[in-house]
Amino acid sequence: MPSSVSWGILLLAGLCCLVPVSLAEDPQGDAAQKTDTSHHDQDHPTFNKITPNLAEFAFSLYRQLAHQSNSTNIFFSPVSIATAFAMLSLGTKADTHDEILEGLNFNLTEIPEAQIHEGFQELLRTLNQPDSQLQLTTGNGLFLSEGLKLVDKFLEDVKKLYHSEAFTVNFGDTEEAKKQINDYVEKGTQGKIVDLVKELDRDTVFALVNYIFFKGKWERPFEVKDTEEEDFHVDQVTTVKVPMMKRLGMFNIQHCKKLSSWVLLMKYLGNATAIFFLPDEGKLQHLENELTHDIITKFLENEDRRSASLHLPKLSITGTYDLKSVLGQLGITKVFSNGADLSGVTEEAPLKLSKAVHKAVLTIDEKGTEAAGAMFLEAIPMSIPPEVKFNKPFVFLMIEQNTKSPLFMGKVVNPTQK
C-alpha cells in the first residue's frame, strides 16, 4: 500500500420531490402499516440541541454558494452534508477534528461532542420513522478497500450513531467500484440520482456516501388545469416562459418587513413544510443575509392564514457541487490536505480527503391530485386578495416538522435552467 493515499468521500442528497403522489404508488407497499411520528419531538429532545446549528450551517453554506455565482440555481441538502462530515469527524483528531465540527457551526465549548453525535443519531432515527403520507429516507454507506483494517471504534460508532452500512470494494477496479457506489445511490434515491461518481482515483481506499430521499404531496394541491405559461424575470434583461401553477385560496403567507420579502409556508401531508421567500425588488441579497434559525422558527410557529392569489412555477433543478472549495471558506481545510489526521479511521496509512461530491435533485409540480382523488374546498373572504407571483428569483427551504431540521435549501434564479 502506498505511504500516502487519498480518501474519497461522496456526499449525496437525493430527490427532493415536492410532488403530490398517490399512496397507491408507495414502492414499499406498506403505507397502511406506517404511523405518524409527531410525538418524537417530546420523546427525543437530543436532536433539538443540534437543529439550530444545522440551520445556521445551512445559511452559511448557502451564502458561500450564492457568493460563487448569482446567476445559477442553488439546491443542496444541509442535513446530508452535515451528517456525512459529522460521521467523518469520528475518525479525525486534533485540528482536523475541530475544524470539521466548528465548520458545521458547533461550538465545542458549549456542546459536548458526544451530544452532537447523539443528536445526529436521534435525528436520523426520527427522519427514517415510517409515515403513511410522506416518503423520507436517509442512508449512509461506507465503501472500504479490500484488506483495509479500520479502527474498531470508528466502525462501531458509525454503525451505531449513524446507522451506516459497510461494503467491501476493489478500488483497483475503478469501473466496478464506481458501479457499486452508483448502484447504492440509485437504489436509495429510487432512481432519481444516477452516476453520481464520474471519476474515481485509483489511490482511493475508502468512500463515504450519504443520501436523502424525499417524496411528498401537498396538503392543499394545485389543479393541473389551472397551470399556464407565464413570464419569469431572471434579471432586468432576461425573461423566460415557465409553466406557472396557480391557486386562489387561504395560505399561510405574510409580508415580512425585516426580510423585505413575502414568506409563504406550504405544508405536505405528513411532517414536512416548504417555506418560500419572494424578495421585494432589489432585496434578494438583503434576504439572503438576514435569514436565521430564530426567524425560521417564528414562521413555523405562525398558523395565521389569509387569502391570496398564488402563482408558483413548476420546475426541476439539479445541484452538483465539489465541496472542497466552498467548505474551505467555512474553515474546513485540514482534512483535504497532506496534514490531515484521520488516524481514528485506520492506522495503516496516512489518509486525506481527496473529494467531497454533493448532488441534489428537486422537482416541484402539481401532479397526482387526480390520482390521489384529492378535492379541497375553502371559503375565501370577499375582499380582493393580494396577488403573489413567484415570477422572479426566490429562495426556499424544506423543513422536517418533528425535528425542525433543514432537509433542503435552494434558490431559483431560472426555472428553465436544469
From Swiss-Prot:
The positions annotated as site (Reactive bond) read 382-383
Which keywords does this chain's UniProt record carry?
Acute phase, Blood coagulation, Endoplasmic reticulum, Extracellular matrix, Glycoprotein, Hemostasis, Phosphoprotein, Protease inhibitor, Secreted, Serine protease inhibitor, Signal
* Modified positions (Phosphoserine) in chain numbering: 38, 383
Record's InterPro entries? Serpin_CS (IPR023795), Serpin_dom (IPR023796), Serpin_fam (IPR000215), Serpin_sf (IPR036186), Serpin_sf_1 (IPR042178), Serpin_sf_2 (IPR042185)
- Impact of changing residue 386 to T on the protein? In L-Offenbach
Name the reported effect of residue 58 to T.
In M5-Karlsruhe
Query: Which residues does the annotation list for site: (Microbial infection) Cleavage?
Result: 352-355
* PTM section of the record: N-glycosylated. Differential glycosylation produces a number of isoforms. N-linked glycan at Asn-107 is alternatively di-antennary, tri-antennary or tetra-antennary. The glycan at Asn-70 is di-antennary with trace amounts of tri-antennary. Glycan at Asn-271 is exclusively di-antennary. Structure of glycans at Asn-70 and Asn-271 is Hex5HexNAc4. The structure of the antennae is Neu5Ac(alpha1-6)Gal(beta1-4)GlcNAc attached to the core structure Man(alpha1-6)[Man(alpha1-3)]Man(beta1-4)GlcNAc(beta1-4)GlcNAc. Some antennae are fucosylated, which forms a Lewis-X determinant. Proteolytic processing may yield the truncated form that ranges from Asp-30 to Lys-418.
Per the record, its GO cellular-component terms are: collagen-containing extracellular matrix; COPII-coated ER to Golgi transport vesicle; endoplasmic reticulum; endoplasmic reticulum lumen; endoplasmic reticulum-Golgi intermediate compartment membrane; extracellular exosome; extracellular region; extracellular space
Q: Where is this region: RCL?
A: 368-392
The record's listing under Pfam families reads: Serpin
A single GO molecular function term of this UniProt record: protease binding
Complex formation: Interacts with CELA2A. Interacts with ERGIC3 and LMAN1/ERGIC53. Interacts with PRSS1/trypsin. Interacts with PRSS1/Trypsin. The variants S and Z interact with CANX and PDIA3.
Disease annotation reads: Alpha-1-antitrypsin deficiency: A disorder whose most common manifestation is emphysema, which becomes evident by the third to fourth decade. A less common manifestation of the deficiency is liver disease, which occurs in children and adults, and may result in cirrhosis and liver failure. Environmental factors, particularly cigarette smoking, greatly increase the risk of emphysema at an earlier age.
Q: What is known of its domains?
A: The reactive center loop (RCL) extends out from the body of the protein and directs binding to the target protease. The protease cleaves the serpin at the reactive site within the RCL, establishing a covalent linkage between the carboxyl group of the serpin reactive site and the serine hydroxyl of the protease. The resulting inactive serpin-protease complex is highly stable.
Q: What protein name applies here?
A: Alpha-1-antitrypsin
- Give the source species: Homo sapiens (Human)
